[in-house]
Amino acid sequence: MAAEDVVATGADPSELEGGGLLQEIFTSPLNLLLLGLCIFLLYKIVRGDQPGASGDNDDDEPPPLPRLKPRDFTPAELRRYDGVQDPRILMAINGKVFDVTKGRKFYGPEGPYGVFAGRDASRGLATFCLDKEALKDEYDDLSDLTPAQQETLNDWDSQFTFKYHHVGKLLKEGEEPTVYSDDEEPKDEAARKSD
């Protein structure tokens, strides 16, 4: 609005600017839509996605399974825990068996890493290969991995140790399983030798 228009209407310029902005927001359908969208997004950000706040239960998620007692597995015994035959999902990485059931969306039958469920995933994770053919059915000693692949595998091992419950170890053919007490946690080979 030009200065002559303001003088001609006899209105205070500060009143017109404030009223003009509010008037522009509330009279334009597009601006009302954008304002509503901004308020909705602000509400979602502040409120967040709080589970149980709406009162509905997520029927897709089964109730959590009780913690598995420590024990060792042969590759054949491990295969049962693929999320199909048994609701629990176990994976072996670097000789350690982890309960990854809480990561069902990733490691379950329909997940992107479902090929590793109930298997020794070490070779697949070390080589970034998601093909079932890359995994061995028997114990894999991983002796042919390059140093870079071994380092990648160690990174995966650390990540799984931090995130998932370590259940036991993967047994080589003819190896005797460790007998764990009910409250004992499985240890890796280095920790076991230092005791």
From Swiss-Prot:
Family: Belongs to the cytochrome b5 family. MAPR subfamily.
UniProt cross-references to SMART domains, sorted A to Z: Cyt-b5
Organism: Rattus norvegicus
Renumbered residue ranges of the record's region Disordered: 51-72, 173-195
Record InterPro entries: Cyt_B5-like_heme/steroid-bd, Cyt_B5-like_heme/steroid_sf, MAPR/NEUFC/NENF-like
Annotated Cytochrome b5 heme-binding domain residues: 72-171
Misc: Non-classical progesterone receptors involved in extranuclear signaling are classified in 2 groups: the class II progestin and adipoQ receptor (PAQR) family (also called mPRs) (PAQR5, PAQR6, PAQR7, PAQR8 and PAQR9) and the b5-like heme/steroid-binding protein family (also called MAPRs) (PGRMC1, PGRMC2, NENF and CYB5D2).
Quaternary context: Homodimer. Forms stable homodimer through hydrophobic heme-heme stacking interactions. Interacts with FECH; the interaction results in decreased FECH activity. Interacts with EGFR, CYP1A1 and CYP3A4; the interactions require PGRMC1 homodimerization. Interacts with TMEM97 and LDLR; the interaction increases LDL internalization.
Modified residues annotated as Phosphothreonine in this record: 74
Regions that span the bilayer: 25-43
Function recorded in the entry: Component of a progesterone-binding protein complex. Binds progesterone. Has many reported cellular functions (heme homeostasis, interaction with CYPs). Required for the maintenance of uterine histoarchitecture and normal female reproductive lifespan. Intracellular heme chaperone. Regulates heme synthesis via interactions with FECH and acts as a heme donor for at least some hemoproteins. May be implicated in 2,3,7,8-tetrachlorodibenzo-p-dioxin (TCDD) immunotoxicity.
One annotated GO biological process: negative regulation of synapse organization
Record GO cellular component, one term: cell body
UniProt GO molecular function: heme binding; metal ion binding; protein homodimerization activity; steroid binding
Name of protein: Membrane-associated progesterone receptor component 1
Entry comment, domain topic: The cytochrome b5 heme-binding domain lacks the conserved iron-binding His residues at positions 107 and 131.
SUPFAM superfamilies linked to this entry: Cytochrome b5-like heme/steroid binding domain
